[in-house]
Amino acid sequence: MSTAELIDDLHPHKPAAAPGGRKKSKPPLALRPLHRMWRKTIDEIQVSALDLPVRGLPEALRGLVACQISDFHVDRDEDLARLASAVEAINQQQPDLIFLTGDYFSGPDTMHRYLGAFRDALKNLRPKSGLFAILGNHDHWSSAERITDALKRAGADVLANDSRRLFIRNEKLMIVGIDDLWSRRAEPSRAFHGVMPDDCTIVLAHNPDTALYAHHLAPGVMLSGHTHGGVVRIPYYGSPIKSILRIGKDYYAGLNRYGNFYIYTNRGLGTFWMRIRINCRPEISRFSLVALAESAHREIPQAKAKRRRRPRHA
């Protein structure tokens, strides 16, 4: 299985200046090439297209299109403009399903400022069969109640240790949403309540480490975010930043197998703490569902040492 194939480069719209606001100063001429490179890694969205192997996928659902975005961190006007561009790009994919996997804001102050505009931007999403969302750690640290309400008003079905049964092309598909791990709200067994052993499931879990506690429930596939792709990506090495995952750095970004199912970790749209990305552009994941070929059992990778409680970057 190859990694994500880049199919499109998208430039976000520039936000309109606020009435009476100051004009943004341009960088010195000598620094403009560096500034353009920095803006490219922060603002130019990459649409990653790939086949997503799903354990137990019915043949009739082969080719179903799903899009995922994560870690919006809408803290500035530029972040809101990037979200608007992402919505437009997702609609161009004509997806059957859209998944939002948490961390919509960084904290309560920016949430209060941008919540209405965030809700209105998401109202423009046009999935054919459903829009589903879960919360991340920053959402619980901001206001889970208010963010959940905004997501619902935008048309999203918000899953918190819950599942939904869909019938698409006359086949059943279960969407399972596990609440955030770092906020100590993840209850995988509760989320899978009512899910039958032979059901095909797409599991949404903000933190890839959730797989450590959910793998025994036999997910069909798991979609996560949280890591921002590692923020800095070095070719043939990955991220040099100290791992915030017990599951390991291999799960920082992209498609990786974990035992008998796959995890896809989206690199996210926004940034937190430091406004930086290096070789790790904002991402929209565009999936075409395929059946995971049955194979011999694979051992579950060993978890690493227990993480510190609340790191500054996530």
Locations of regions flagged by a protein language model:
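Binuclear metal-dependent hydrolase catalytic cores centered on His/Asp/Glu-rich metal-binding motifs
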Residues: 149, 153-156, 162, 168-213, ...
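Core catalytic region of metal-dependent phosphoesterases/phosphodiesterases
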Residues: 78-167
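Conserved beta-sheet core of the metallophosphoesterase superfamily
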Residues: 153, 208-288, 293-296
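Active-site neighborhood of phospho(di)ester-bond hydrolases with catalytic His/Asp-centered motifs
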Residues: 67-70, 97-103, 130-137, 159-162, ...
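Acidic, histidine-bearing metal-coordination/catalytic regions of metal-dependent phosphoesterases
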Residues: 1-66, 76, 294, 305-314
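Beta-strand-turn-beta hairpins that frame and shape the catalytic cleft
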Residues: 54-67, 156-157, 164-176, 197-198, ...
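Active-site environment of divalent metal-dependent phosphoester hydrolases
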Residues: 74-77, 106-109, 135-148, 159-168, ...
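Acidic/histidine-rich helix-loop elements
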Residues: 37-41, 69-82, 105-114, 139-143, ...
